[in-house]
Design a protein with these regions (language model features):
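Conserved class I S-adenosyl-L-methionine
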Residues: 49-58
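Glycine-rich SAM-binding Motif I of class I
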Residues: 60-64
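Conserved SAM/SAH-binding beta-strand->alpha-helix loop
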Residues: 80
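Conserved SAM-binding strand-loop segment of SAM-dependent methyltransferases
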Residues: 97-107
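Short conserved loop adjoining the S-adenosyl-L-methionine
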Residues: 109-114
């Protein structure tokens, strides 16, 4: 499947690059290709009993895909409030929304939950 087909299946909108807040300290929003996520999801490294922590989650593509593919729980961390709002908006329609949470915070200030098994 291509990028748009995966987004449609997962009922999210994550395609496209966003350079609006990029500078020498912050990367632009650029979603991880689904082909990479498919390989990771099929690797067996992330399982249903795992909790995944996704630093720089953007609009939540990694979180929604891997929670769909592996049934893991996922926590997405995003510092950009505008991009975070898009992730929350995606959660309203995503098919794996019940296993995904988002937090808007600078990663340096986030306390790692004890249940997190994969980062």
């Amino acid at each position: 499947m291509n990028e748009n087909e995966w987004d449609k299946l997962l009922k999210i909108h994550t395609t496209g690059r966003d350079d609006s807040n990029a500078d020498q300290y912050r990367y632009p929003y650029e979603p991880t290709p689904y082909s990479v996520l498919e390989r990771l999801g099929n690797s067996g490294w992330i399982r249903k009993e795992n909790t995944l922590l996704d630093y720089g989650c953007g609009k939540g593509r990694v979180d929604f895909f891997l929670s769909y593919q592996t049934r893991c729980r996922s926590i997405g961390i995003e510092y950009n409030e505008r991009i975070y709002a898009k992730a929350v908006e995606n959660k309203e329609t995503a098919i794996s929304a019940e296993r995904v949470d988002f937090v808007v915070v600078n990663a340096e200030q986030f306390s790692l939950p004890v249940e997190v098994a994969r980062i």
